[in-house]
Amino acid sequence: VEVTAVRQETAGPVRVTYRDEDGGEHELWADAVLGCDGANSLTREAIGGVWEDLRFEERWKVIDAETTGPVRCWEGVDQVCDPARPGTFMRVNETRYRWEFRLRDGQETVRELIAPWLPPSYAGDFEVVRETQYTFRARLADRWRGGRAFLLGDAPHLTPPFVGQGLCSGLRDAY
């Protein structure tokens, strides 16, 4: 299901138009709309909201790996605040770990990025099961509400997705 339009009059309910999985168009009316529709928010556009670009943009890499050998970590999330290489690291379960690193110019290998967490003579099995990149941009909407439509999560503000913080910020917005 994909929302294709959000419209509201001065008073009364909000009209939401959506397309179902078969391509059929439908409408429904709601007392309020919570626009949790991300960085490219249709709801933000519907209320006339625009981004303020805070001119901050960084590329990050996420690496999920399975390993049988020892990894230097503690039970929790490590947030590394090194200006040369900020990052986030956590144990997901007994054998799976996640690293997130800000990328610099010149692509480092996965082994170079995670070397600080592995002993020099690391002998365990190590398999990258997921590797992806994203670009974090700092942007803030000039409004979070228009009539009976409200913005939550990445629709009004972009948040780095460290360990689910993108989702968690949307829940905090709702509270």
Summary of predicted features, one role per range:
Residues 1-175:
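Core Rossmann-like FAD-binding/catalytic domain of the broad FAD-dependent monooxygenase superfamily
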